[in-house]
Amino acid sequence: MTTPGTIIFLNGTTSSGKSSVLNHLQPMLAWPFLDAGIDKFIWMLPARYLNERELWDTVLGHAASAGPLGHTLFSGMHHAIAALARAGNHILADHVLVEPIWMQECAMLFHELPAYLIGIRCPLDVIEQRERERADRTLGQARKQYDLVHAHGIY
């Protein structure tokens, strides 16, 4: 029987520093950890879904809730992370858990695996400054997510 891999799951608002933490942590870890974060799954979509209107309306929703395709995509992400870990892979993943059902689904899928859910928090003024400085961000998104992403469970 394969020993399951460890899951390190980072949750926080957009622009909170999740990807930066992941990118700094990954090369420092003793074992190879796969990057199975939210952006990797979003970029699997066909290009037509990645334009700003489709991405927000169909996939990500409007900052505080997911669009219809987002529910399917991110449920698949959660199941894929669990399957990869059960096959013995170590996983690093960052996410924006705006939907309570996503936290519940991850808890159900990861409960028999060595998994760590880590909240990435940053002061709102810092997040909003980062949001303004980055060309790929929608202004106001971080503020809408700020309290929501950490409201669905405890770390």
Name the predicted role of every residue range:
Residues 1-5:
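Phosphate-binding P-loop
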Residues 110-133:
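Conserved phosphate-donor/acceptor-positioning beta-strand/loop module used by diverse small-molecule
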Residues 10:
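Hydrophobic anchor at the beta1->P-loop junction of P-loop NTPases
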Residues 64-113:
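Glycine-rich phosphate-binding loop used to anchor ATP phosphates in small-molecule kinases
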Residues 129-155:
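Small-molecule kinase domains that catalyze NTP-dependent phosphoryl transfer to phosphate-bearing small molecules
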